[in-house]
């Protein structure tokens, strides 16, 4: 949890995304559930909303617990973003293992559950940044593959604010099991088809640019089969030195049948280097990545249609909401080429197709 000055100017959020299937229509949708805390040391018996005219007028920073839940859009079917706010006084927390609850919303390492019901009247208040609708979830969670970011997420670098936003990919391949009820329609979530993802971010502000890319649905060109214990995760970050921002970096891990290929500055002995490019067209976002270290090289290309993405809203600890949209979706597709260095040459390990990828981008 947030401590010290971060508790007065900081955030922590736990993200989950996964697929569910409606048993009556066989429709597949990609859902998301996020638990977040903003400036907990400033909390009172009521949530302080940074976009509310009263709190803006009095110069109060936001402080609340928030549940954000919804579904990403599909062609011909719009997405939904629901937000509900709770006071810090409603928070119950236990450690070892970590457990968090406020009202009927529960988070633990192996289960999440809760509900949101937003009326049309409530949704008309722009300060709440929410659509109207209802969402109920009750899910078992099994985090099968984690991303290891090395020393950069330890207590010292967190205390000196070496990054604007820290990341722990605690479940870059996660299996969900349970049910979701969206506006009265039930969806079943099964481990083998959930293609789930779970992570945690915390810090003093959100990354600019905001860049994220991940998939736990990898298919081998060698065998034509879906890979087990395999996943890709990429997260952008903004390092600082003596409080001055440095060149933007990415943290990348490709787990291939249980073997981790890591490309980030949290593992300095691997001599990692990463390049990336993001292109926005009228219809799509397109990503290209190339990363290498002492023992391997990976090339990644992926894209997602804007019809399957939506702008998500976030309020920063200082009470600001960016005018630049954060586009996010859950159906990115693309290719991966993975090579191993053998002497002075490269040996192809495998070519992979990926589907059902989580993708997010907000330019600076």
Where are the regions a protein language model picked out?
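Structured soluble/peripheral alpha/beta segments that form catalytic or ligand/cofactor-binding pockets
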Residues: 1-364
């Amino acid at each position: 949890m947030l401590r010290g000055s971060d508790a007065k100017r900081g955030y922590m959020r736990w993200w989950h995304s996964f697929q569910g299937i409606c048993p009556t229509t066989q429709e597949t949708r990609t859902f998301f559930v996020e638990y977040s805390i903003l400036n907990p040391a400033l909390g009172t018996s009521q949530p302080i909303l940074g976009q509310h005219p009263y709190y803006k007028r009095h110069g109060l920073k936001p402080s609340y617990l928030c549940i954000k839940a919804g579904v990403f859009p599909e062609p011909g079917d719009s997405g939904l973003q629901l937000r509900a706010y709770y006071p810090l006084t409603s928070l119950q927390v236990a450690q070892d293992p970590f457990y968090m609850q406020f009202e009927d919303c529960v988070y633990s390492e192996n289960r999440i559950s809760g509900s949101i019901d937003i009326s049309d009247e409530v949704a008309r208040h722009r300060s709440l940044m929410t659509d109207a609708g209802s969402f109920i979830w009750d899910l078992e969670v099994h985090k099968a593959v984690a991303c290891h970011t090395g020393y950069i997420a330890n207590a010292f670098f967190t205390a000196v604010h070496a990054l604007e936003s820290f990341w722990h990919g605690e479940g870059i391949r996660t299996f969900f099991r349970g049910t979701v009820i969206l506006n009265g329609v039930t969806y079943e979530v099964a481990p083998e088809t959930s293609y789930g993802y779970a992570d945690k971010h915390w810090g003093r502000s959100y990354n600019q640019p905001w860049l994220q890319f991940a998939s736990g649905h990898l298919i081998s060109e060698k065998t034509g089969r879906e890979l087990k214990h395999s996943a890709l995760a990429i997260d952008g970050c903004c390092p600082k030195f003596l409080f001055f921002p440095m060149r933007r970096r990415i943290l990348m891990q490709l787990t291939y049948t249980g073997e981790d290929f890591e490309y980030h500055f949290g593992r300095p002995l691997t001599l990692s280097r990463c390049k990336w490019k993001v292109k926005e067209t009228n219809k799509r976002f397109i990503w290209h990545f190339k990363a290498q270290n002492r023992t391997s090289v990976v090339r990644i290309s992926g894209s997602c249609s804007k019809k399957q993405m939506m702008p998500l809203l976030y309020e920063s600890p200082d009470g600001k909401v960016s005018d630049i949209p954060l586009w996010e979706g859950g159906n990115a597709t693309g290719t991966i080429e993975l090579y191993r260095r053998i002497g002075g040459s490269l040996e192809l390990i495998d070519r992979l197709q990926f589907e059902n990828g989580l993708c997010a981008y907000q330019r600076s």
